[in-house]
Amino acid sequence: MRRLRLSATALGLTAALGLFAGTAVADQPTRMEHDLLGDKAVPASAYYGVQTARALENFQISGTPLARYPDLVAGLAVTKLAAARANAAVGALDKKKLAPIERACEAIAKGQYHDQFGVDLYQGGAGTSANMNANEVIANVALEMAGRKKGDYAAIEPHDDLNMSQSTNDAYPTALKVAFIRGNDRLVPETRRLAAAFRAKAAASITILKMGRTELQDAVPMTVGQELHAMAADLEAAAQQLLDAERALYAVNMGGTAIGTGLNAPKPYAARCARELAKLTGKPIVVASDMIAATYSLQGFVVYSAALRNLAVTLSKIASDMILLGSGPRAGL
């Protein structure tokens, strides 16, 4: 059922973005937008802009849009919200623009407008098109909330206002970290809930004797409860490792801009942005101790990936054991 829903979402995105097999839908009302490459027609109803429209044409690779991953879209919105508040606080962003930008980011973080995030997960650069997709959608939603028309960038500009004091190289990895943190907030409790279920079954079967095995051969006696208790302990350890690994995601390079030197970002901005992210996520987000290292290194992602892999291996092991234990019914293990 979930796959069917996702497929419907993908079809909805295709229609909303005005694309089918790479061909624009005919007779669709458009508005003209301009970038350094020239003018381009964008669907009038779209909240994205010219940069996203070009990316939709250039990067039809996997067929998997950003919208398929709501935590990532929300992570982009939360990151942009923190950046806007930090820029306003240090006097870089006109505070009159902040209110509609805040409302737009909050709406996207709550799940609205996700059908406008159609850029392919595989794209040129280090997330440049995804970053601009977020900038353009937030800008146009903010414009509409301020009573203006989409594309009225003299009032709120996707790059100058929404990407202020930022680069894709600090905004996108920070958004990814926020996305993983949001996912972890659901994954850890569910893992612990599964562990609790195994522990309850273990308590109910602690006196049932069975044969313990090594390499599938008879070894020494044990109880079913002992076996299930071990599975519960393994899951609890995996959940704790996820929590421990999450801490590797707390150091962000927002304010480092393109390579970590912080060029074109006001000096107080980085610390203020980290504080705003901490408020929005409820986590102790901090500025990375070395912004250049944090910009080129994937260490935090590798640490968290290892914890995810550990959980996957743990679940696979338990599932395999359950298959063997459920063999039979007359002459099984």
Q: What kind of feature is each model-predicted range?
A:
Residues 4-6, 13, 20, 24-333:
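Conserved, well-structured ligand/cofactor-binding cores
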